[in-house]
């Protein structure tokens, strides 16, 4: 049976925008004018936290990192070619109620989301891209090709999958080019009967609004991995005004660090022994509550400098979330092609991210202002044990990245 492979790639790095997107995003609607985006962000957030909780079961006590916007976008694009229960399961698995939100509205929502994320922003490089590699022997429907190009700004390539090594090289070369060499050899074991590969990637680069002074980074600070394990990490230090709060209901401290433009990071530090309680309570409503209660004030802040990466095969997890027919022999992708027997073989997701003194990647030198020396009246927030990390795009409130840092020394 011919196989469909879905590869979801996310980078907290600098990437080159795809040529096919040039000239398309200049007419993008302002997110403030489109209520669909806010509805989408809430649904995607709840999907993100549900998926996150699945990860905590599958890989307990380990670093977790993925893109809550990249995965739904890739699956929603896949649903364009799905019909009947195959399509229904994909969209309902993403958290959509098809009675309240028709399929056309969902696809329009993702179109506006991608358009808004790709809209040029000063001092913030953010780009979501899609590439579809279709076997030369497959006869895709024109409507499907038009939809993936117009709704998802997808580049489509006709690929000879009969030559597995050449097809693999073509895909890897495209990914390497789009990520400016950051990802080399993404696909290593392309299956011989693969006939279509969909690649979704999200690239991000930004500078902190208040960069850390590298001279204040302590190289050998202790980070508690568990009750018996401590590792040494570079710990960044800064006295600055941040939005923060103590959530007494969830027993955690929340700190917001702004990027220079249109993005922010939420660091969530549960009290010792309370991580599972916080994880179980995370939802779109929780984010809205924090957004309402965060207050700005001076903080003596300690945050580890680290990189994190993760690779997942999402197949088993998506099956448990109700997306089953797409992987079965009776999968219905008649919206993609009239050829019979196409099914999804695997859904791979790769995520990479780096946090340092200046942001997610090295940027031009900046000047550091003198900070107040007195710390007696300022709260000390020290991320020296397991914490949660969320990166959000401000305009759409979309969660770009979501993760848990258990051991910052494990890249």
Curated annotation (Swiss-Prot):
<protein>
    <recommendedName>
        <fullName>Thyroxine-binding globulin</fullName>
    </recommendedName>
</protein>
<keyword id="KW-0325">Glycoprotein</keyword>
<feature type="binding site">
    <location>
        <position position="394"/>
    </location>
    <ligand>
        <name>thyroxine</name>
    </ligand>
</feature>
<dbReference type="GO" id="GO:0004867">
    <property type="term" value="F:serine-type endopeptidase inhibitor activity"/>
</dbReference>
<feature type="binding site">
    <location>
        <position position="291"/>
    </location>
    <ligand>
        <name>thyroxine</name>
    </ligand>
</feature>
<keyword id="KW-0732">Signal</keyword>
<feature type="glycosylation site" description="N-linked (GlcNAc...) asparagine">
    <location>
        <position position="163"/>
    </location>
</feature>
<feature type="signal peptide">
    <location>
        <begin position="1"/>
        <end position="15"/>
    </location>
</feature>
<comment type="similarity">
    <text>Belongs to the serpin family.</text>
</comment>
<dbReference type="InterPro" id="IPR023795">
    <property type="entry name" value="Serpin_CS"/>
</dbReference>
<feature type="glycosylation site" description="N-linked (GlcNAc...) asparagine">
    <location>
        <position position="34"/>
    </location>
</feature>
<dbReference type="InterPro" id="IPR000215">
    <property type="entry name" value="Serpin_fam"/>
</dbReference>
<dbReference type="InterPro" id="IPR023796">
    <property type="entry name" value="Serpin_dom"/>
</dbReference>
<dbReference type="Pfam" id="PF00079">
    <property type="entry name" value="Serpin"/>
</dbReference>
<feature type="glycosylation site" description="N-linked (GlcNAc...) asparagine">
    <location>
        <position position="97"/>
    </location>
</feature>
<feature type="glycosylation site" description="N-linked (GlcNAc...) asparagine">
    <location>
        <position position="251"/>
    </location>
</feature>
<comment type="function">
    <text>Major thyroid hormone transport protein in serum.</text>
</comment>
<dbReference type="GO" id="GO:0005615">
    <property type="term" value="C:extracellular space"/>
</dbReference>
<dbReference type="InterPro" id="IPR042185">
    <property type="entry name" value="Serpin_sf_2"/>
</dbReference>
<dbReference type="InterPro" id="IPR042178">
    <property type="entry name" value="Serpin_sf_1"/>
</dbReference>
<keyword id="KW-0964">Secreted</keyword>
<dbReference type="InterPro" id="IPR036186">
    <property type="entry name" value="Serpin_sf"/>
</dbReference>
């Amino acid at each position: 049976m011919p196989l469909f492979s879905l590869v979801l790639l996310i980078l907290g790095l600098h990437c080159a925008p795809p040529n096919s997107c040039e000239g398309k995003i200049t007419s993008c609607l302002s997110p403030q004018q489109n209520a669909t985006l806010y509805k989408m962000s809430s649904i995607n957030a709840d999907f993100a936290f549900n998926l996150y909780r699945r990860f905590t079961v599958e890989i307990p006590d380990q670093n977790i990192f993925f893109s809550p916007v990249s995965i739904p976008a890739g699956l929603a694009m896949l649903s364009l070619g799905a019909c009947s229960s195959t399509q229904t399961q994909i969209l309902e698995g993403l958290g959509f109620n098809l009675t309240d939100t028709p399929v056309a509205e969902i696809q329009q929502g993702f179109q506006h989301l991608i358009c808004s994320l790709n809209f040029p922003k000063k001092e913030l490089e953010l780009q979501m891209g899609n590439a579809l590699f279709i076997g030369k022997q497959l006869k895709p429907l024109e409507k499907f090709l038009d939809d993936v190009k117009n709704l998802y700004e997808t580049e489509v390539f006709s690929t000879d999958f009969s030559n597995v090594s050449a097809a693999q090289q073509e895909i890897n070369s495209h990914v390497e080019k789009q990520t400016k060499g950051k990802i080399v050899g993404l696909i290593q074991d392309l299956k011989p009967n693969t006939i279509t590969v969909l690649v979704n990637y999200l690239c991000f680069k930004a500078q902190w609004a208040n960069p850390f002074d590298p001279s204040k980074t302590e190289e050998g600070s202790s980070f508690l991995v568990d009750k018996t394990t401590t590792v040494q990490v570079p710990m960044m230090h800064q006295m600055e005004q941040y939005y923060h709060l103590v959530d007494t209901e969830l027993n955690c401290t929340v700190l917001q660090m702004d990027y220079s433009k249109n993005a922010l990071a939420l660091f969530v530090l549960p009290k010792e022994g309370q991580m599972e309680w916080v994880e179980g309570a995370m939802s779109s409503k929780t984010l809205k509550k924090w957004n309402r209660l965060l207050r700005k004030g001076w903080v003596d802040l300690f945050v580890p400098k680290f990189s994190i990466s993760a690779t997942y095969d999402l197949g088993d997890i998506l099956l448990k979330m109700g997306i089953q027919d797409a992987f079965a022999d009776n999968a219905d992708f008649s919206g993609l092609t009239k050829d019979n027997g196409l099914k999804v073989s695997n859904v791979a997701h790769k995520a990479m991210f780096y946090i340092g003194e200046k942001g997610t990647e090295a940027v031009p030198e900046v000047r550091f202002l003198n900070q107040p020396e007195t710390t007696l009246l300022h709260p000390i927030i020290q991320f020296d044990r397991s914490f949660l990390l969320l990166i959000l795009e401000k305009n759409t409130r979309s969660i770009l990245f979501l993760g848990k840092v258990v051991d910052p020394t494990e890249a």
